[in-house]
Structures are given as C-alpha cells and as structure tokens.
C-alpha cells in the first residue's frame, strides 16, 4: 500500500491510498466505513445528444466523484473492493453509485482516523517492501503450498503421491520433481516445513536440481502439515527470521496468552461485558478485537475508551485460526494489568 497524507486536524482529514495487492484491498475493507467520504475517478454515462428518447450515442467518460459510503464489500475471488453510496460531489449528485477498487486504483478517504486505523495503514505500507511469503508443508507423499496473505494462509496447490498423470508421482523422486515444479516460480521468502526428515531430503534433492526457491528457503520442524503446520511456523517465530515483526505471529502469540490465562484463571477478560468493566476500571493493557466487529456500533465507543486509557488495540483476522478462536470468545478479549475479582 502507498499512502499520501493530506491535512489532518483532530484526527479528521484526507488520506490518498494506492492499493498494490489483494492484501491492500483487504486492509481497505477495514479502513473504509459507512459514513466516510470517498473520492475516486470513475466512469459515468454521458449522452451525446439532446434527444432523451433515442440518443444518438451514449458513452462513458472518466469523472471524479465523491461518494458518501453506505456499504463496503470485499471479494477475494474477484480481487476487488466495492464501495457503494450516494454521490455528494461531482456529476449526478444524489444518485447511487458503486466504486470498484482494484490494485493500482487510487482513492481518497476523508474520515476520522482512529489510532487503530493508522496502525493498520502503517502495517499495510510497511508490508509492501517485502515479497509475499510462501510456506511449503511436506511429509512422505503429500505436500501443500500456501501463500501467506496478511489476513491468513491461502492454499495454492496440494500434491499427493500417485495423483499425477502417467504415474509421475508414483515414486519418491517423481513426487519431489512435481513439488519442485510447483514452487519454481516462487520469488519471495519461503519456508519448507513438516514433521520428520522428508523436508530435509526434499531440500537436498531440490538443491541438486538447482531449484532456487528451495536453495534460499528456511527449513522448519512442525508436528503436522497443511494449515496446521502454517500456524506452527508462524507461532514459532520462524517468519521473523525472514522479515522481522509479522502481525500474524503476534496474533498467534497473543491468543495463546489469552487461552493460557483463561485456563489458569489469570488476569484476563473476554466478552463485551467483562471487557467493558475492565476498561472502566483502567485494568486493561491490551485489547484483542476480531476484525468482524470493527464496525459494530457498540464496540466503537468501547475501543475509544480503551485508547484513552492508553491500552493497545490489536485487530485479529477472523480468516486465520487465532481470530476464529477470538470470535468464539465473543470477538473481544483483554489482557489485564492485574486480576480483577
């Protein structure tokens, strides 16, 4: 994400945003809310004749519009963000319009920027400096490649011994060759993980085949493969050896701490009522919030109160297991400075 800050006074103002990836579009989904004013260049129909019954020509021209947001929808598969609302600035004022935001498309957002919004924006901007991380999970006869999005792992391909055409994966070397083909185009950081010694055998074989991604990969031990192995890798801090601090690593560690404190009846609060009470007493150190609650009208004043108490706000993606666990606890939890009675 690229961002250009305009004039911001008392946390209210304009920021120009340039999404560069699907991760950036996902961030925008949580940065743009109903009530915001969004400016963008879009296309509107312009009639080429004064005859309104049978115009000679109807063409679409680029125009800059300001839309008061009513709805925001993000599509992983369509790789776009739909921002819908009423036109307040530009042609056809009062009409309903949808801005389709794709990568490389500039928008300007005017709103009140909370600290949690600016933290997310800063994270999106910093994330653009390193390549997308891939994690290959591997055991005997089975492999799965994941692309690590900022909202969680995305499965790219699954390979099983004996599943290829012509039996090319029937043998161990044939299976390894198929896996090598699947990672050949990976250009960014990579981790190869799994239980046992198969991953080491694969890396040695792949290096002998001059497979560049395997040559620069970090090898990690996990108890399992698949999505569970990805969480093991993230939770162990392996990715921080590649790129430094990573939000997903922090999410795993924080939720582990939440569950540990719950099991020990420690300094923890979860669920709206208990967290609200803890904030009221100034006992909160960190608040964990599921991203699905960011626009909840009851949650917004609660988060604002926590920020006034100097508590840290960490938003967890519900598309990744730690966020799913948090959602099961009511979508909000707080690590406390001391245990409350």
From Swiss-Prot:
GO terms for biological process: nonfunctional rRNA decay; nuclear-transcribed mRNA catabolic process, no-go decay; nuclear-transcribed mRNA catabolic process, non-stop decay; ribosome disassembly; RNA surveillance. It comes from the Archaea. SMART domains: eRF1_1. Its EC number is 3.1.-.-. SUPFAM superfamilies: Dom34/Pelota N-terminal domain-like, L30e-like, Translational machinery components. Signal peptide: none annotated. Monomer. NCBIfam families: pelota. The N-terminal domain has the RNA-binding Sm fold. It harbors the endoribonuclease activity. Belongs to the eukaryotic release factor 1 family. Pelota subfamily. This is Protein pelota homolog. It comes from Methanoregula boonei (strain DSM 21154 / JCM 14090 / 6A8). The lineage of its organism: Archaea, Methanobacteriati, Methanobacteriota, Stenosarchaea group, Methanomicrobia.
């Amino acid at each position: 994400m690229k961002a250009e800050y305009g004039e911001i006074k008392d946390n209210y103002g304009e920021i120009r945003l340039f999404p560069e990836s699907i991760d950036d579009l996902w961030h925008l989904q949580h940065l743009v809310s109903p009530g915001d004013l969004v400016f963008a260049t879009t296309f509107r129909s312009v009639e080429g004749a004064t005859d309104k019954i049978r115009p000679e020509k109807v063409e679409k021209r680029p125009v800059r519009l300001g839309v008061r947001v009513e709805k925001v929808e993000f599509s992983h598969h369509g790789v776009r963000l739909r921002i819908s609302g009423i036109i307040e600035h530009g042609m056809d004022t009062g009409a309903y319009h949808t801005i389709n935001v794709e990568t490389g498309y500039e928008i300007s957002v005017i709103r009140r920027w909370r600290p949690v919004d600016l933290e997310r924006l800063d994270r999106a901007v910093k994330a653009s400096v390193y390549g997308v991380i891939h994690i290959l999970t591997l055991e005997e006869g089975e492999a799965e490649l994941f692309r690590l999005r900022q909202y969680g792992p995305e499965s790219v391909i699954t390979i099983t011994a004996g599943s290829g055409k012509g039996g090319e994966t029937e043998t161990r070397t044939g299976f390894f060759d198929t896996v090598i083909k699947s990672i050949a185009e990976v250009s960014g950081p990579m981790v190869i993980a799994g239980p046992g010694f198969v991953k080491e055998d694969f890396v040695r074989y792949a290096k002998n085949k001059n497979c560049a991604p395997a040559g620069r990969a970090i090898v990690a031990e996990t108890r399992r493969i698949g999505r569970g192995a990805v969480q093991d890798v993230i939770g162990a801090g392996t990715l921080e050896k590649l790129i430094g601090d990573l939000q997903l690593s922090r999410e795993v560690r924080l939720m582990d701490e939440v569950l540990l404190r719950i099991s020990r009846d420690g300094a923890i609060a979860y669920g709206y009522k208990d967290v609200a009470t803890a904030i009221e007493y100034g006992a909160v150190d960190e608040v964990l919030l599921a991203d699905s609650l960011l626009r909840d009208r009851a949650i917004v004043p609660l988060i604002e109160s926590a920020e006034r108490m100097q508590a840290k706000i960490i938003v967890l993606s519900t598309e990744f297991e730690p966020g799913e666990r948090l959602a099961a606890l009511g979508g909000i939890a707080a690590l406390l400075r001391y245990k409350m009675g």
